[in-house]
Amino acid sequence: LCIGDLHEPFCLDGYLDFCVDIYNSWDCDRIIFIGDVIDNHFSSYHETDADGLGGMDELELAIEKLKPWHDTFPDADVTIGNHDRMIMRKAQSSNIPTHWIKEYKDALGTPTWNFTERVVVDNVQYIHGEGGTARSRCIKDMQSTIQGHLHTQCYSEWKVGSRARIFGAQVGCGIDKDAYAMAYAKNFPKPAIACLVCIDGETVINEMMPL
């Protein structure tokens, strides 16, 4: 099961239960979070909400809201998203060596999660997806690709040639579009609230959450 961007503490109520239902209904045996498990709105390089939570308050709430995810799916890979790495970027901007920075799993109270840039399962690569759409990335890398990042996109699309076939798939996300941290996207298309099941690297199912 591949779970979309959470952006905790701004994840949509009910998304965890939905993901659990999909995991059980397809008898899944592996979990991959596609990245941006936290939002880090307070430390954004863009304008932040003046009435929003301060840094420690947002972090503590994000940790609190990640705990049920970690309790439910303790063995998981997490591809590191642009929002996840925001604090690391701020540290680099301040010339702070990485030796001083905690690992993601330690800072977020998720000790058994594996945070990584890329996961490959059944010859399918899972990445967060800042570099473009899944349909273009799979062609660029000549490898089936599943990614997140683009909240409004949810699809699977095959590219078939004379000697090979690959697919690109967008997972969708689990964000609460009405949260203040998502105000920047108020005039964007609605987010696709969904997760994705990939079976043996060949069958891809986009599961949309009933809303």
PLM segments and residue spans:
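Short acidic low-complexity segments
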Residues: 105-121, 130-133
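Core catalytic region of metal-dependent phosphoesterases/phosphodiesterases
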Residues: 3-107
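Acidic carboxylate-rich catalytic motifs and surrounding loops in phosphoryl-/glycosyl-chemistry enzymes
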Residues: 78-83, 114-117, 206-210
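Short, conserved catalytic or adaptor-binding loops enriched in Gly and charged residues
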Residues: 104-108, 159-162
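Conserved beta-sheet core of the metallophosphoesterase superfamily
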Residues: 120-207
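Short hydrophobic beta-strand that contains or immediately precedes a catalytic carboxylate
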Residues: 2-4, 146-147
